[in-house]
Curated annotation (Swiss-Prot):
InterPro entries for the chain: EF-hand-dom_pair, EF_Hand_1_Ca_BS, EF_hand_dom, Recoverin
Chain residues carrying a lipid of type N-myristoyl glycine: 2
Keyword terms: Calcium, Lipoprotein, Metal-binding, Myristate, Repeat
The keyword Aminoacyl-tRNA synthetase is assigned to this record: no
Organism of this sequence: Dictyostelium discoideum (Social amoeba)
Name the UniProt record assigns to this protein: Recoverin family protein DDB_G0274781
Tree of life domain: Eukaryota
Pfam families referenced in this protein's UniProt entry, alphabetically: EF-hand_5, EF-hand_7
Region annotation (Disordered) ranges: 1-20
Domain EF-hand: 78-113, 114-149, 174-209
Gene Ontology MF annotations: calcium ion binding
List of residues binding Ca(2+) 1: 91, 93, 95, 97, 102
């Protein structure tokens, strides 16, 4: 990763003792939109997830620790269409691990970024192959995850079980309808892909999808909000 993570933090959480490196915290604060308290908190979360900095923060360990980010003011990302993509977005050097700088810089956009920065990050989430455009298949995949996360949240909220096959089939159908609608109105040159500006236009006019279950409703944003 090539990133200096500083000395091991000194914390008493869970019996672990980490020594906080205030110089590193200051550096992270100055290079992101976080204040000192927020940068320190995320510094601690990172070291908790990486076993005190002794183990690389890989995809599995990152996903297991998503709920810890709620204490930092982030929403429940493990129940969102972006949970699986967030690791890829933070891993900017594509070495299949997330270092401290990548971790906090990426979360800085999610927590404190401008609307434009969040839209750009959302575009990258949809652009699964990273070629700078979104295909109908990529758009449909992310829309399907949005529907699935909405229905899962409703199922938990209402204590009603949802058949997995029915959920997948319905979510796939709705995602295809939304993707077809987006490309029909935005892909005017018929090249089968959306640019960032075209995606932005759609996201601003259709900021969410709404899942319904026996009278209950759940809105799911289609971008980082």
């Amino acid at each position: 990763m090539g990133n200096k993570q500083g000395k091991s933090p000194n914390n008493s959480k869970g019996g672990k003792k980490y020594k906080i490196d205030n110089d590193v915290v200051k550096q992270l604060q100055e290079s992101t939109n976080f204040d000192k308290v927020e940068a320190k908190k995320l510094y601690e979360v990172f070291y908790d997830l990486s076993n005190g900095g002794k183990e690389p923060l890989n995809r599995d360990r990152f996903k297991e620790g998503l709920t810890k980010l709620e204490s930092c003011g982030l929403k429940n990302l493990d129940n969102s269409p972006f949970g699986d993509r967030l690791f890829d977005l933070l891993d900017t050097n594509k070495d299949n691990t997330v270092d401290l700088q990548e971790f906090i810089s990426g979360l800085s956009i999610l927590c404190k970024g401008t609307a434009e920065e969040k839209l750009e990050l959302s575009f990258k989430a949809y652009d699964i192959d990273g070629n700078g455009y979104i295909t109908k298949s990529e758009l449909s995949q992310m829309f399907q995850q949005a529907w699935i996360s909405g229905f899962k949240a409703l199922s938990y909220q209402t204590n009603e079980e949802v058949n997995k096959d029915d959920l997948n089939n319905f979510s796939e159908e709705m995602a295809q309808i939304f993707a077809d609608g987006a490309f029909s109105s935005l892909d005017v040159n018929g090249d089968g892909k959306l640019s960032f500006n075209e995606f932005k236009q759609f996201a601003m006019s259709h900021p969410k999808i709404t899942a319904t279950l026996n009278g209950s409703k759940r809105d799911v944003p289609i971008t980082f909000d």
